[in-house]
Structure formats: C-alpha cells, structure tokens
From Swiss-Prot:
It is an enzyme of class 2 (transferase). One of its GO terms (biological process) is tRNA wobble uridine modification. InterPro entries: CmoB (IPR010017), Mo5U34_MeTrfas-like (IPR027555), SAM-dependent_MTases_sf (IPR029063). GO terms for molecular function: methyltransferase activity; transferase activity, transferring alkyl or aryl (other than methyl) groups. The gene is cmoB. It catalyses: carboxy-S-adenosyl-L-methionine + 5-hydroxyuridine(34) in tRNA = 5-carboxymethoxyuridine(34) in tRNA + S-adenosyl-L-homocysteine + H(+). This is tRNA U34 carboxymethyltransferase.
Length: 330
C-alpha cells in the first residue's frame, strides 16, 4: 500500500504541521475508498520496481532517472513493460533508465514558457494544484524548491508519480497527495502555488481563486495557467455542452476578465507573462498514450476552432501576489 508516513514526518516540524490535525484521516478515507478497483493492481506493479539507485538524475533540464547503462537489455525490457501498465501517460516526458516515456503532453514546453517569469524557487515550499503525474513537481525540485507538494485525486496519476519517485533512488522532498483543493484547509503556508490547467474545470472559478489564495502565505506568489479567449474584461466563454470534446469545461475568460477576477480576490502585482495557442505538436497521440488527442478535438477543416466551433485552445499564464484579504470575500 502506498504510504504517506514520510510526508507526515517531514512536515511535523514545519509551517505545515497543523495540517496533520486532519490530513491522515482524509488520506486514510481515500485509501479505504480505493481498496477495490485499479489501485491494488497498480500497487502490485509498484512493488515490482526493484532496481538499483540510478547512476544519474536530472531534474534541472528534464526529468531523467538513470542513463540505461546499469540495466541489461532484459532488465530494461522488463522495466518498460511494467511502466506501460500505467498507461495512458499524459504529462511528461520522462526518461527512465534509457526508456523514453513519450507522453501525450510536452509538459516541458509549458515549463519553458512559465519558469522564466516566476520568482526563484530556491528554498521555497511549493504547492502544485492539479499536478497530474508530477512532471512539473520534479522540475520545481530541480529549480531549487525546498519542498514540493502536489495534489491530484487521480489514483493513476499517484501511481505514475510513485513509480518515478521509487526509481529515482532517493527520498526526495516531493510528495503527491490524492486530494482535491476543496479538501485542503486554509494553510497560509506556501511560498508559491501553481494552478496550471485547472481553472476551466472548476464550476466556480472565483471559489478556486480564493482556495488558491488560502494556501499562500502573505506575499506568496500564484502562478495561474489556464485557457483563455480574446476579448475585454467582460468576455467569458461558457460552452453550451462540450469544449474540445471535454464535458467538464465551465468558464473560459479573457485575460482581462481573469485579471479582474484576481484583483477582486485581493491579489496584487497581477501580470500576464505569456499567451500561447496550443500546437498540435504539444498535445498529441503517442505510443504511451494511444487515445484521441488534440487533433481529434479540433475542426478537421479549420484548426483555429474546436470540433464544436469554439476558438481553439489558447493558454495564458498569469502571475499574482497574495495581498491582505478583503473580509467580504472570506
């Protein structure tokens, strides 16, 4: 069974220690609810990942664990077969003992767009909301973060993350907890909070921004990356049904509207540092994710539109700082 005890130990003497009043019970409940289904099967695969400590790790320019020279061809083939049991792999890529996990998303491209604009992560405590399988968490560690906590309720993402962590050979201060942000108390403790690719999935985007604010210390930095549309501060797209075949997209604001929302939630120093139309090469079908991907979500005759006729995915990165809260919003 996946254990969270090392995380409990690491935060016992930190500014996250009051989280221990509720977190073990919440995670215990999650484990009981998932003792059937796919999780036990994936945990059995995790228990087979007994390999020597890697001869090299790199979290600065990639997520690389081992060079592949330590394993025989047979051992490498066995490891690849085990890792394929965690398919589909959506966020990455990962390089594990010479095995290239070519994920659906080129998450490294997003990191290259975002990372030049954020405050240095050196010695920071970081929260990654909706972290997926943890690719960006490893890059945050590589950028010098003291501790990285990711939250995502998906059992598959948890197991993909655990696979990489176990193969990395060290007890790195990087932890994925299978939680949604609504299960977090107001911690007021993180130096930087990332929310990338989450806001448009939330039924109440203002509540999500307030939840993100509640996790930051005063003066902490929010890094928000989300879908946007063109338009002024009153422009917000609310898809009638699906957007890009997704039935869980609720609100897609303009950059101006999003910045207004952040101001209303008592963030300051709000700035848009990047906008980017998602390229077909950034999100695509691969051998490690053989299902439909972006090309199937767009109009085959006009890739500037989704299959439903909405503007094709365009993403913006907004950076803001937590200010003293307005009592009317809390």
């Amino acid at each position: 069974m996946i254990s969270f005890s090392s995380f409990y130990q690491q935060i016992a003497d930190s500014n996250l220690q009051h989280w221990l009043e509720t977190l073990p019970a919440i995670l215990g409940k999650w484990q009981r609810e998932h003792k059937h289904g796919n999780l036990p099967k994936w945990e059995k695969v995790l228990n087979k990942l007994h390999y020597p400590a890697p001869d090299r790790v790199d979290f600065v320019s990639s997520v690389t664990v081992g060079t592949g020279e330590q394993l025989t061809p047979g051992e490498k083939e066995k490891l690849e077969n085990l890792l394929r049991l965690f398919m589909p792999w959506r966020k990455g890529p990962f390089h594990i003992h010479g095995i290239h996990i070519d994920t659906e998303w080129r998450s490294d491209w997003k990191w290259d767009r975002v990372s030049p604009h954020i405050s240095p992560l050196q010695n920071r405590t970081v929260l990654d909301v909706g972290c997926g399988s943890g690719y960006h968490m490893w890059r945050m560690l590589g950028a010098g973060a003291k501790r990285v906590v990711g939250i995502d309720p998906s059992p598959l993402f948890l197991c993909q993350f655990e696979a990489v962590k176990r193969l990395s050979g060290e007890n790195h201060p990087v932890h994925l907890l299978p939680l949604g942000i609504e299960e977090l108390p107001p911690l007021d403790a993180f130096d930087t909070v990332f929310s990338m690719g989450v806001l448009y999935h939330r039924r109440s985007p203002i509540d999500h921004l307030l939840q993100l604010r509640d996790q930051l210390r005063m003066g902490g930095e929010l890094v928000l990356e989300t879908l946007v549309i063109d338009g002024d501060e009153n422009a917000v797209l609310v898809p009638q049904d699906r957007y890009g075949k997704m039935n869980n997209v609720w609100f897609i604001p303009s950059v101006a509207a999003l910045m207004l929302w952040l101001k209303k939630c008592d963030f300051t120093d709000i700035r848009c540092v990047d906008t980017d139309v998602t390229a077909l090469a950034e999100q695509r079908r691969t051998d490690w994710m053989p299902n439909e991907s972006l090309v199937e979500y767009l109009d085959p005759n006009d890739i500037t539109k989704t299959i439903e006729g909405y503007p094709a995915p365009k993403r913006a990165t907004i950076i803001a700082v937590k200010n003293q809260p307005n009592q009317d919003l809390t």
